């Protein structure tokens, strides 16, 4: 992926001038954030479109080190401060680092998925996403190219979840939530989000084995207008099962590991997706009725 050096410098300089985020460029050209005595950078895992078998975007993850000999977990960094203020600052810095590394000076149409800490969603009472939008505005990226992944912990408070979705969507972000494998209650609660349904619902690939046939659940999620992403795909069997179930998006180490390289010239072999249409068509007839009933508003 070609990078315009002058454009990258301009965008980094604008962030440095407009915010107090400690961001610098490493020797390899990647942007680094600095939090206490830790250096933070990004890795990106490809997310595939199950229909085209090509890369649709990437999920961003933070990596941090104190020194080359002493790796430090990003979550350990949070213990360096007390209260929510350091967490808010850390979380926002991570997302700034991600978007600079993913979008700055790069010409591609991929979407970027970023996570948000549960405590941040609780501590920031209103207007979630406004501070992040200001960073995107500085580097000229539309919020519609960013998917906000809301952690599964927030599913325990559906009132908060609905409030958070409303705030982020008002700024134009796409929203992804996590399925927590709670059966019919989860489907009914998903229905209760009306009209604030998520854009993407993330399912663990392990659900394929637990349910036997995840197709009916995928069908119900589609009825809410959401795409289904199967994540943590570790085997060829899980990949095949996800495609047969009707997945829209696919992610996991079997398809690509998180790395600094942002690659788009990757493809899933056609053999894994060839039965998608026939399987989905036949399943429409046998979708579980109790799922359908739970989905009705």
Regions found by a protein language model. Give the residues of each.
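Short acidic, S/G/P-rich loop/turn micro-motifs used as interaction or catalytic elements
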Residues: 119-123, 153-157, 181-184, 206-210, ...
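Catalytic core of bacterial cyclic-dinucleotide metallophosphodiesterases
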Residues: 2-15, 52-90, 108-120, 142-152, ...
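ATP/nucleotide-binding catalytic cores
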Residues: 133-137, 171-184, 195-196, 228
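PAS/PAS-like sensory domains
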Residues: 37-43, 109
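Catalytic core of bacterial c-di-GMP phosphodiesterases, primarily the EAL and HD-GYP domains
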Residues: 90-160
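Well-formed, non-transmembrane alpha-helical positions, independent of function
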Residues: 52, 167, 191-192, 241
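EAL-family c-di-GMP phosphodiesterase catalytic domain
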Residues: 1-34, 39, 153, 194-297
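Short beta-strand/loop segments at the ligand-binding rim of alpha/beta enzyme cores
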Residues: 164-179, 217-230
